[in-house]
Amino acid sequence: MSSKNSLSDKIKITFQYIMPKHAISRLVGKLAAAKMGWLTTKLISMFIKAYGINMNEAKLKKASDFDTFNNFFTRELEEGARIIDNDENTICYPVDGAISQQGDIIDGQLIQAKGFNYSVTSLLGGDEKTAAPFQGGKFSCIYLAPKDYHRIHMPMAATLREMIYVPGELFSVNPLTAQNVPDLFARNERVVAIFDTEMGELAMVLVGATIVASIETTWAGTITPPAGKDIFRWQYPKDGADAITFEKGDEMGRFKLGSTVVSTFAPNMISEFATDAGPGTVTRLGEIYAALDKSAS
């Protein structure tokens, strides 16, 4: 814990370690999935007002249109609300949010915050073979705030090869915890999706957090393995009729309540991130994030 933290920040961080994070998250998850009529509508209305959510871009625009808080939180946008960049030489932002960190994976390490790194191997579930294709590559970490659109889309065309569920803690994910909780993204519960692309391998890691009720993918629905410490893996065919393929901008998952998406890219996939992209940059789904290094393909 940084000595520069205020007393209130130190209390908040200490509370993160001692509070029953899983129990709280399960309770919130049940409430978020409950159909409570007028009370649900009231809570959604309060949430919209508190966070200044722009419902004009949502397909369903009124609080009363949603029968559960989860359905509101994972709301669909109306057609045309986000334009997906169609340049095959770029990748696009996969979510609305804000960049926490981005850069090179050096000696197997990703930057979490100043003074804190974590390993790509631990992030992807502890298997060195899974992590090997990303050694020397690049990474991006984007935080989704409560006000953001919470569906996750593909930054480029790809074919799903593997999904990994990694059990773990449920620390809150925000700038304060990123700067004070070591290995935050590699110790929280998460779902890892490994893809093949024409440029190499891509991993998208959907990181859970306190009160994140659940994580969904478009191919497997809500990920709910048995409680415990076991890591679960699912393999998928690379080709043929059963292959699961995505075009750039296709939805691949969603958070029921929000958190963070960490993406790792194989070496020589990305030539450079956009000049206006960096820690703190607000991201908008579909806009150009980085240039692909086509010279290496």
UniProtKB/Swiss-Prot annotation:
<comment type="pathway">
    <text>Phospholipid metabolism; phosphatidylethanolamine biosynthesis; phosphatidylethanolamine from CDP-diacylglycerol: step 2/2.</text>
</comment>
<keyword id="KW-0670">Pyruvate</keyword>
<dbReference type="InterPro" id="IPR033178">
    <property type="entry name" value="PSD_type1_pro"/>
</dbReference>
<dbReference type="Pfam" id="PF02666">
    <property type="entry name" value="PS_Dcarbxylase"/>
</dbReference>
<dbReference type="GO" id="GO:0006646">
    <property type="term" value="P:phosphatidylethanolamine biosynthetic process"/>
</dbReference>
<comment type="function">
    <text>Catalyzes the formation of phosphatidylethanolamine (PtdEtn) from phosphatidylserine (PtdSer).</text>
</comment>
<dbReference type="GO" id="GO:0004609">
    <property type="term" value="F:phosphatidylserine decarboxylase activity"/>
</dbReference>
<feature type="site" description="Cleavage (non-hydrolytic); by autocatalysis">
    <location>
        <begin position="258"/>
        <end position="259"/>
    </location>
</feature>
<feature type="active site" description="Charge relay system; for autoendoproteolytic cleavage activity">
    <location>
        <position position="259"/>
    </location>
</feature>
<keyword id="KW-0210">Decarboxylase</keyword>
<comment type="subunit">
    <text>Heterodimer of a large membrane-associated beta subunit and a small pyruvoyl-containing alpha subunit.</text>
</comment>
<keyword id="KW-0443">Lipid metabolism</keyword>
<dbReference type="InterPro" id="IPR003817">
    <property type="entry name" value="PS_Dcarbxylase"/>
</dbReference>
<dbReference type="InterPro" id="IPR033177">
    <property type="entry name" value="PSD-B"/>
</dbReference>
<keyword id="KW-1208">Phospholipid metabolism</keyword>
<keyword id="KW-0472">Membrane</keyword>
<feature type="active site" description="Charge relay system; for autoendoproteolytic cleavage activity">
    <location>
        <position position="96"/>
    </location>
</feature>
<keyword id="KW-0594">Phospholipid biosynthesis</keyword>
<keyword id="KW-1003">Cell membrane</keyword>
<keyword id="KW-0444">Lipid biosynthesis</keyword>
<feature type="active site" description="Charge relay system; for autoendoproteolytic cleavage activity">
    <location>
        <position position="153"/>
    </location>
</feature>
<keyword id="KW-0456">Lyase</keyword>
<comment type="similarity">
    <text>Belongs to the phosphatidylserine decarboxylase family. PSD-B subfamily. Prokaryotic type I sub-subfamily.</text>
</comment>
<protein>
    <recommendedName>
        <fullName>Phosphatidylserine decarboxylase proenzyme</fullName>
        <ecNumber>4.1.1.65</ecNumber>
    </recommendedName>
</protein>
<dbReference type="GO" id="GO:0005886">
    <property type="term" value="C:plasma membrane"/>
</dbReference>
<feature type="active site" description="Schiff-base intermediate with substrate; via pyruvic acid; for decarboxylase activity">
    <location>
        <position position="259"/>
    </location>
</feature>
<keyword id="KW-0865">Zymogen</keyword>
<feature type="modified residue" description="Pyruvic acid (Ser); by autocatalysis">
    <location>
        <position position="259"/>
    </location>
</feature>
